[in-house]
Amino acid sequence: DKYFKKYLDNYVFLELMPHYIKREHLDFMRGVPMPVKKEFLKELAGEEGIKIQYFIEGMIDLIGLDSSFRYAPQYINFLNYVNKDIPKVIVSLAIDFAKEEQLIHAAVLLRAALRINRDDPDALYNYMLVCRNLYNDSDDDDYIADLKMEVFESLKHLKEVRPEFAMTYYFLGFAYINAGRYSSAAREWKTFVSLSGPCEERGEIQGRLTELEIPVKIEQAYMDVINGRWEQGLAVLESYRGDEMLKGWWPLYYYLGV
């Protein structure tokens, strides 16, 4: 939330007119402040007033900007009342914004869709992609680390709700590589290969799996040492000490040092 809450200052709050609440049977919205962007306030002076669409957009933004916002439950009820397929609508809008490189707005919308339905696979996948693009465009270490965690958590959840989706395992492999967890990366990529059909990514990952064979053996040997199987683990690690291909590869010497 800390990267999004600053945008709350762009909104002001109004209340629905009593006659509108009565006409639309919206008793659950009585006394609930409705968010609207400041730029739309000028329309209050018009004959038609502020369009309900602006309130809908504001509610979506608010639940995406602040996951603990006080009136989020009422906003979600209202959005579902307006359109029972509202998460699909929001995801579609987010994809459009992402295509236009408006990544922050896309992320906010996808966070909102996930607040309405945390198991929505399309929202999870696209939120992951947007977060990847956001951290790839940044040089702030804390920001990058936080968004990498968002990517990782989204992928793990997506794996639970849609285990047959091959691309989840493709991206999970890279997430584990970034964390230096080679055995886990190999496991996810093998699953990707088994689930995917002929595609460019499949050939790429088959090549990466070959490259991972030695790092996986070294990582497993390190785990042997950690778990008390000293001789077995050190024998494997020492066997790679003079390997020219691994010269300068810090994980090997880190494991040997440990």
What are these regions (language model features)?
Residues 113, 157-158, 192, 240:
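Canonical positions in the second alpha-helix
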Residues 44-47, 73-91, 203-216, 243-247:
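TPR-adjacent "capping" and linker segments in tetratricopeptide-repeat scaffold/adaptor proteins
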Residues 84, 118, 162-163, 180, ...:
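Short coil turns that delineate tetratricopeptide repeat
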Residues 123, 168, 201-205, 216, ...:
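TPR alpha-solenoid repeat register
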